[in-house]
Amino acid sequence: MRIYQAAHHDTRVRDYLFTRRLIWAENTVNAGLLVGNREFQAQITSANPVTEILTGGSLLLDFGIEFHGAVRFVTGSAAGKIRLRFGESVSEAMGCPDQDHAIHDAELVLPRMGMLEYGNTAFRFVRIDALDRNVQLINVHGVALYRDQKVTGAFHSSDERLNRIWDTAIYTVRMNMQDFLYDGAKRDRLVFMGDLHPEAKAVFCAFDDVSIVPDSMDFIVSHSADTADMNWIRSYPF
């Protein structure tokens, strides 16, 4: 039963993804405890050890697959300011990610014995730096947002590479199926009529519910003047 009747209902679901690998750590204690950790809730006292990033320390986590969503921190009794970087690759997360269309590099203040969720982008890796004091982490996990739609299309051949291409294509377009059908889950996170053409073909081939396609087209039309080209690109209206 929906409680907020006047609200816009989010058609997406959310899954928590656990850390698959600890790629790099510096000035940390028990960093490996984050791998496969299934803790969700902060607590006042716990007999279990926690991960601690010492002041100036950092670590790099791998969630094992790229996804669209956020990262969620569950913190212990020591918390402070961190620098958080998202990356589709290790080199991006270890560098200075751009801020195009979503924040990929931010300074955040973590609460004591609490939870903080941050991000709205596509990523696989996160780097976390403790800036001003030691930080205790009970857990760090990814929050994947996606439309839980049945895949009704299928492709199979004797060439395993072609089979993987099909699987990757379906997964990629599913990441783009958010509030509307984005041109890209990381960037530009916008609805472009030109990008809708190949994406719509993939949606029609793969999923049972294709309502996101007309919804996205209606969105573009409603934001285009009668005398202007869609997305300001001359070839898009044709």
Model-derived regions, located:
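Extracellular/oxidizing-compartment recognition motifs
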Residues: M1-D183, G194-D195, D208-I220, D226-S235
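Conserved short loop/turn motifs at secondary-structure junctions
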Residues: K186-L190
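Secondary-structure capping and boundary motifs in well-ordered enzyme cores
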Residues: V191-F192, F238
